[in-house]
Amino acid sequence: MKKILLVAAASAMFMAATAQTVIAPPTLDEAKEKGFDALWGDYQFGYVLPNDYTLVDDDAVKVVMNNGSTEKPGANISTSSLNTTVFDRAFNMGSSANYGKNGEVYNLADVSNGIKQPYAIFAVTPKVGGELTMYTNRGKNKYTIYVWDTTINDGEGAYVLASSTHTDSYGKELISKETVGLIADHTYWVFASETGANTLMYEMVYTPYSSENYSVKEFDATKFSTVIAPPALEVAKEKGYEALWGDYQFGYVLPNETVLADSEDINVVMNNGSTEKPGANISTSGINTTVFESAFNMGSSANYGKNGEVYNLADVSNVIKQPYAIFAVTPKVGGELTMFTNRGKNKYTIYVWDTTINDGEGAYVLASSTHTDSYGKELISKETVGLIADHTYWIFASETGANTFMYAMGYNSYASPNYGYQSDSTSAISDVIVNEMPQSDVIYNVLGQKVDENYKGLVIKNGKKYIQR
């Protein structure tokens, strides 16, 4: 059973840097106690969270809600019409940003100016590096979740996430997931696009490198509608692929233009566009893990955490040191792509560049940075980003002096039963058990507060998560 720390203070979260931190709206009871305004004049709809409200400040991360608006200050918190029974409340989000546009951000007013409602914008400052996972929904409508790093690029800032979703006819109840790596002591603004009405942010979960839940400990291919992984060594030999460094004990070289997947959901081609170092080294030894048997070697002319513009494939494959993998990914159905990566204790960035967005000019939709350092070279990081149907994305990694490992990618379209939030995936604490009551009288909500059997939503008992309905 996973060990967790439950803190019963009203605004407390999981305080140890070895745990995960849940960022969720305060409960309705707490809002009433603090005198927060009722939403639309009646607490049956929720309440308004005031600006400059510290949601969490523990050993791992500090999160403050402040939308920077004087006309629509604060954030509406909904407790009804949530499109789900998994969560019992949600931050309402929106901004002056457009769906899938990635316009530059120079100050908080750039994203809060002209907002239609009090919408949540978060300032997130990790004290320890790790990954931030968000669980969001906008019914059947399109929306983008943005994470802007205010510190990166020598203080000029850049997007590290611009994850777009449009579940459309697949169901308004689908809960999407976005995961991005954050750098210690950087400050990030998290906001959503304006879509005509509010986007729902149910919960954010921050997992530092030190958490036992950070690294991937097993890989279940059945959880994805399409898996992208290196061909087996036996297949490489059958096809006559060149042995890596002259001996198959090290792996092989995957040729350019290799189609890795062409399913009903997605097409994936490996092509680094290089004439000097064509193909991609596939390692079968020295890959820092026993969870996977092989890995794509990745690297490029891009730097760690720099987010330079990309105009063509040569921009990222020029002067690469080895045959490094670059992927062209074209979803046929919208969904989410999860990547499993590693670079030992060294720093690296996984980039996803949308070549189609911004009227064909392109933009980053992911720039997830990792530096596990002293936490262990075997840690496997995860990155999850929403992809738009019929867009083409280039996926590459920064150059770090040696190769980054991409063990596998998994894609789930909106139609997949494993899309987005899953009860057996991490939602901060432990496994979720649906409609099964715990045996003890002591029950907590996700904020560590004692509740009873009449409480609706996520509750905690003995380190496990349950849904009370």
Question: What label would you give each PLM region?
Answer:
Residues S416-L447:
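Residue-level detector of functionally pivotal "anchor" positions at catalytic/ligand-binding pockets or at interdomain
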Residues K140-G157, K345-E361:
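Short, surface-exposed beta-strand/strand-loop-strand elements in extracellular ectodomains
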Residues T21-A109, E212-A314:
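N-terminal targeting leaders for non-cytosolic proteins
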Residues D88-R89, G94-K127, L174-E178, N198-M201, ...:
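Short beta-strands within extracellular/lumenal beta-sheet-rich domains
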